[in-house]
């Protein structure tokens, strides 16, 4: 499966059960990266994608367990450790800022045998610079 996450400079993802930030340009980039694939999300993330042009997205609290090998999973509030063996691709969006955090990205791409394939930067709607890193096995 393909995992998509957003992190701060310390790999933080959430604070006090809330996302650290949001950016409409980033959501558009995610939608454009799906290559007609399925997007699976937790109910918490639904409002981020409700007005986007995603052809097929599925909402489930068990989305990581239900994902097929070619599915994309947008992860904000779940641990990835137990699902690590099934991850073939990891897309990390970096806010390039420090935010308070108590939930962190709990996998290391290098430890999973992944290599950095590409890095791109773009200006977001609420961030001067967002970095997109694509890792693959």
Where are these regions (language model features)?
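Enzymes that bind and transform nitrogen-containing heteroaromatic metabolites
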Residues: 1-137
